Amino acid sequence: MIHAYDKLYLDKAQTALGRMLDFAVYELHHTLEDFFTLFLKTGLADRFGSGDYELLVGMSGVELAYTVLEEAEKPVNRKKIPYTADRSPEYWTGWALAYYQWDTALSFREIIQVVPIAEIVAMYTPYHEMDIRQFVDHMNERYLKANPDTNLKRLRTRAGLSQHALAETTGVPLRTIQQYEQRRKNINKAQAEYLLMLSRTLCCRVEDLMEKVIPSSE
């Protein structure tokens, strides 16, 4: 699986996003939903999710929260806040969400469109006591339920091709195409030749065929 950025920065990213949300709610007195909307609208979420070194490593969660407000042109009254070791539900939300975004390389917007931030914070109990992979599996199930079609099926349909026609044109076996579209075979592990022929026929990039969310059974 291709992750959003180097794992070297993951721990820092989780801490920063968790602290940002905790600080925004408990010190800046924003609602979780409103503040995360600002995070998305300012473009900082996209930068963070793509591994922007300045945001992942160069800022603390508190600094990131202030930057969101500044970018959104909201009033900012900086104050010195003592570090707290408390781990609120909002902190866990940022911590877990940062991990999931890194793991799947989905954008934060794509994630929130399927599972709103209010629903994620509501998962604090019981998921904060579980291994993070159980949270990931649950989020993946939600995402796949909301997006049942694979990228291959979506691109094939857009091109106006049947499975049989795509197989005839590309030389990829019909059964293999069916298995990719049914998620019974992982297209991310497909032969390079298959991916190249499919991308040429469907007028897309090879990476457009890849799946960011894979069923846990795979």
Feature-to-residue mapping (PLM):
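A short, Lys/Arg-rich alpha-helix, primarily the initiator
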Residues: H138-G160
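Short coil turns linking two alpha-helices in DNA-binding domains
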Residues: S162, P173-T176, Q191, R205
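DNA major-groove recognition helix of helix-turn-helix/homeodomain DNA-binding modules
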Residues: A65-E73, A192-D208
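Recognition helix of helix-turn-helix/homeodomain-like DNA-binding domains
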Residues: V172-N188
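Conserved hydrophobic/aromatic packing and binding residues within compact polymer-binding modules
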Residues: L152, L166-A167, I177-Y180, L209
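N-terminal interaction modules that seed assembly of large macromolecular complexes
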Residues: L10-T67
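Short, basic-rich loop-to-helix N-cap that marks the start of a DNA-contacting helix
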Residues: V57, R184-M197
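Short, charged recognition helix plus adjacent turn
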Residues: M210-E218
